[in-house]
UniProtKB/Swiss-Prot annotation:
InterPro entries: Aminotrans_V_dom, Aminotrans_V_PyrdxlP_BS, Pser_aminoTfrase, PyrdxlP-dep_Trfase, PyrdxlP-dep_Trfase_major, PyrdxlP-dep_Trfase_small. The lineage of its organism: Bacteria, Bacillati, Bacillota, Bacilli, Bacillales. L-glutamate binds at residue 42. Pathway: Amino-acid biosynthesis; L-serine biosynthesis; L-serine from 3-phospho-D-glycerate: step 2/3. Its cofactor is pyridoxal 5'-phosphate. It comes from Bacillus cereus (strain ZK / E33L). GO terms for molecular function: O-phospho-L-serine:2-oxoglutarate aminotransferase activity; pyridoxal phosphate binding. Homodimer. This is Phosphoserine aminotransferase. The keyword Ribonucleoprotein does not apply. It is found in: Cytoplasm. Binds 1 pyridoxal phosphate per subunit.
Length: 360
């Protein structure tokens, strides 16, 4: 069977050259006579893999020296707990900006550890926009402020990162890390599950300023303490070695594409193809505030559930798969991460045009 265009929100499409290299090296990595999946994480071979992955991420994101890159497990969802356990150490209070389902889940976990202040929310607008933050991030006595830079389910993103001068800014970048340029120095902590733009499921990346490490409560479990990973080069226990290896290959691929600035321009072009059609369409609509449209996750719908289902079925027959929207939003959603080629988006738009002509 030919490969399809996979618009899944995660686990998501990986670059074909990466998959082909994985296939080539699967049973015999670098002449070792064994697979990465069989290799000791204490071996020099794996040490070079994790070091290269860290160095590539530092290079691609221009990460300052005062930050650690940590390779973790448990997904972004475990970070919802790790963050307050490690950072709620002075005021026992944190600020959260609610912009979607995932930011709400992050807040709910933080409430189990300390006090949470909702700084701003777009929930009344059904998370179709990003709330204004002007003047809301002042001299509050907070241990950190948490945002979600891209809302995978709702299809919104921050256009400008809020300025927080006296409080560490924590960002969930799971669905748009490496898709556009960010100034890492504006953040105290960035985290992301790998399964959208970095690699396969099983790996979580954390980029954390070192002065935020070491403040966890003494009751914090060892495996939930950032210091454990920082002191042990993310090798305190067996890491998700295969996921780290594939992520390294994805980072190499991204560098070959010209880095983050080049992929950002391509992502803008891909998303514009779809948004331009949606803006002109008489059948399909997008629920998102145009100012805050995501480059990565694009929800859209037709006037009826019957048409939505027909669209999805015929799309699948054309090799355009995993377009069903999240159950909380409905309709369709096209996730067009870094690895999605321009021709994949163009084929989707071409099909949408044909479907509209058939259903005038």
């Amino acid at each position: 069977m030919e490969r399809v265009y996979n618009f899944s929100a995660g686990p998501s499409i990986l670059p074909l050259p990466v998959l082909e290299k994985v296939q080539k090296e699967l049973v015999n990595y670098n002449g070792t006579g064994m697979s990465i999946m069989e290799m000791s994480h204490r071996s020099s071979y794996f040490q070079s893999i994790i070091d290269e992955a860290s160095n590539l991420l530092r290079e691609l994101m221009n990460i300052p020296n005062e930050y650690d890159v940590l390779f973790l497990q448990g997904g972004a969802s475990l970070q919802f707990s790790m963050i307050p356990l490690n950072l709620m150490n002075t005021y026992k209070k944190a600020g959260y900006v609610l912009t979607g389902s995932w930011s709400k889940k992050a807040l709910q976990e933080a409430e189990k550890v300390g006090e949470v202040q909702v700084i701003a929310s777009s929930e009344n607008e059904k998370f179709t926009t990003i709330p204004k933050l002007d003047g809301l991030l002042g001299d509050e006595k907070l241990d950190y402020v948490h945002i979600t830079t891209n809302n995978t389910i709702e299809g919104t993103k921050y256009v400008d990162i809020p300025r927080v001068d006296k409080v560490p800014l924590v960002a969930d970048m799971s669905s748009n890390i490496l898709s556009e340029r960010y100034d890492v120095s504006k953040f105290g902590l960035i985290y992301a599950g790998a399964q959208k733009n970095l690699g396969p499921a099983g790996l979580t990346i954390a980029i954390i300023k070192r002065d935020l490490i070491g403040g966890a409560d003494r009751y914090c479990p060892t495996m939930l303490n950032y210091e454990t990973y920082s002191k042990n080069n993310s090798l305190y226990n067996t890491p998700p070695s295969f996921s780290i290896y594939v992520t390294k290959l994805v980072l190499e691929w991204l560098k070959e594409q010209g880095g983050v600035s080049a992929i950002e321009e391509q992502n803008k072009m891909k998303s514009s193809l779809l948004y331009n059609f949606l803006d002109e369409s008489k059948l399909f609509t997008s629920p998102v505030d145009p100012t805050y449209r995501s480059l990565m996750n694009i929800p859209f719908t037709t006037p009826s559930e019957e048409l939505n289902n027909e669209f999805l079925q015929k799309a699948k027959e054309r090799g355009l798969v995993t377009l069903k929207g999240h159950r909380s939003v409905g309709g369709m959603r096209a996730s067009i991460y870094n690895a999605m080629p321009v021709q994949g988006v163009q084929q989707l738009v071409n099909y949408m045009k044909e479907f509209e002509l058939e259903n005038r």
